[in-house]
Structures are given as structure tokens and as C-alpha cells.
Amino acid sequence: MKNQSKTSSISQNTNVLEALNDVLKLRRERFWTITLMLIVIFATTLYGTLRNPFINTFSKIGNYFGYRVLYIIWAITVSICIHISSILLFKLTDYSKKMGSLGLLFASFFLIVTAIIPSIKEQLPFWHILHKWTTFFYVMSMITALHPFFVWLGRKIPRLKVLLRNWQLFILIGSITSLLIQGQTGIFELWFFWGLGTLMIYLFWILFTEKIEEAEQHEHIAEKEKNRS
């Protein structure tokens, strides 16, 4: 009987520790995903406003004004932050489609390559055209990675369906409006990353918070069972 009681006590202590570790892990992941996306917004705003974004694209800022190194650093930073935070969101929501992870990988690759390729139309026309294509493939990769996920998430959590649809439309309409009014400028790029960043931060906060609350309930239950014994 003593051995059984001791075994039961060890098991209950283990359950409490596991529940506590789950809570701490989720809190850490919530902190880092939000921090990473804030870095995306901050870095994008900082780089995109080095020159007038109503006139200059990110590419032009990097290639025509001597900010090529900063352009590459921005692309690497943004790629890593979006990739890591999105993968953590996929894991949190049990999104298992490989196309999402593959799309993020390609998006990171194409954004970094886009920044590395020189884009000076007058002097390097071939590289300028290649730069345009890698930009296009970056956008397509991001759409492939995230749009199906948002649709899937809206079906899994119906209360988010309208918000996800409207937020994506907000980003799309804002981007198209920017292109029609300003042409291809930095405002288009700023709008995209601002819109995506704020959407992701919102999702990180509400989804991680819900998981944390569930884990805390499990922790309280495990603690009560331990105290009863």
C-alpha cells in the first residue's frame, strides 16, 4: 500500500510539473512569436522609410541609394522572423499540410535572393528582370503558404472566419489601391507587411492565450488531485 501511495504521489507530481511546463512553454512561444512579428514591422518601417516610400520601392532604396547591405539584412531578418513565427503558429493549431511549411521555405529563399540580386535596369537589365521574377515568386510563395492556412483556420475556428477573410481583403484592396494610385512604390510593400504583421500578432495573442488558459486549467486540476492525496 505504501509503495502504491508513493507511486501515485510521484505520478501526481509529474502531472503537475508537466502541466506547469506546458504553461511556461506556451507563454514563451507567445512572447517570441509576437516579438518576432514586431521586429518584422519595425525593421520594415525603418528600412522602407530610409527614402520617401511614396516614390521609391524597397528595391530602389537598396540599389540606387547605397543601402544594398541594409536591404539584404532586412530581407534575411524578415524572412527568418516570419518563417519561425508562422511555423510555431502551424504547430499550435495542428496545421499539418506540408504546402504551408514548403511555401514559407520558398518565400524566405525568394525574398533573400531578391535582395541579393542587383536591380539597376539601365546597367544590368538581365538581373533587373530576374529580380522582378524572384519578387513575383516570393509573393506567390507567401500566398501558397498562408492563404490556405487562413481558410483552414477559419473552418476550424468559425468565429475567426469573417475576420480572416476581411483582413486578407483589407491587405489585398489596400495593396491594389496603392498600386493604382502610386504605382509600384514602397507604400505597397509597407502596406503588405504592416497588414500581415498585425494580423499575425492578433492571431498569436488570441490563440496562444486560449491554449495557455487550457493548460492552466489542467495545472489547477493536477494540483487539486495532488492536494487531495
Enumerate the predicted regions with their spans.
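Alpha-helical transmembrane segments of multi-pass integral membrane proteins
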Residues: 30-49, 70-81, 102-118, 137-145, ...
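Transmembrane helix-loop junctions and nearby membrane-interface residues
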Residues: 45-52, 83-93, 112-122, 143-153, ...
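Non-cytosolic membrane-interface motifs at loop->transmembrane helix junctions
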Residues: 63, 123-136, 186-196
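Terminal transmembrane helical module of multi-pass membrane proteins
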Residues: 151-229
